[in-house]
Regions:
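Short, well-ordered turn and helix-capping elements at secondary-structure junctions
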Residues: 32-34, 71-78, 108-110
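A conserved, well-ordered hydrophobic junction motif at loop->secondary-structure transitions
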Residues: 35-48
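Short, ordered coil/turn segments that flank beta-strands lining enzyme active or ligand-binding pockets
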Residues: 33, 37, 131-132
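HotDog/MaoC-like acyl-thioester-processing domains
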Residues: 3-7, 13-16, 20-26, 81-82, ...
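Phosphate-binding glycine-rich loops and adjacent basic patches that engage nucleotide phosphates
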Residues: 6-20, 46-52, 65-67
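Hydrophobic beta-strand-centered segment that forms part of the acyl-chain substrate-binding groove
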Residues: 41, 52-89, 93-95, 99-101, ...
């Protein structure tokens, strides 16, 4: 393999500056069962993966059970294809008395082409609850 004609694996996996150095909350590979007849991955599958990532982040912060109460914003920038490795990056946007809002960005590493592309972004809100499913306060100084 010539260095002039072939890209190295490290070159192909170079992350864009927006995600370089960040660790995804979850990373999954889109499979055929996740797609529609046209071969694109269902938007609902992407939404559910984003929800899992956001809930994991909220739970780690609150150290308590959380439930999804809303999606305030959701944008689909590009399709996800079968075989893409999708990374979900989370960032805490707001913390209220009982709620946590998490910004979630999804990036696909393309199986074909070997490049990263931002595919979705959204704001998900979670509420902390007790065993009886009642909202509970998030302790300060988390």
């Amino acid at each position: 393999m010539s260095k002039n004609t072939e890209k190295s694996f490290d070159d192909l996996r170079k992350m864009p500056s927006e995600i370089e150095g960040r660790i995804p909350t979850i990373r999954v590979i889109a499979m055929p069962a996740d797609s529609n007849p046209a071969g694109d991955v269902f938007g609902g599958w992407i939404l559910s993966q984003m929800d899992l990532a956001g809930a994991a982040h909220a739970y780690k912060f609150a150290k308590n059970r959380v439930v999804t109460v809303g999606i305030e914003a959701m944008n689909f920038h590009k399709p996800v294809f079968i075989g893409d490795e999708v990374s979900f990056f989370t960032h805490m946007e707001r913390v209220g008395k009982t709620s946590i809002t998490i910004k979630i960005d999804s990036w696909a590493f393309r199986r074909k082409g070997g490049a990263y592309e931002k595919v979705t972004e959204g704001l998900y809100t979670y509420v902390t609850i007790d065993a009886e499913r009642n909202p509970v306060s998030i302790p300060e100084n988390k």
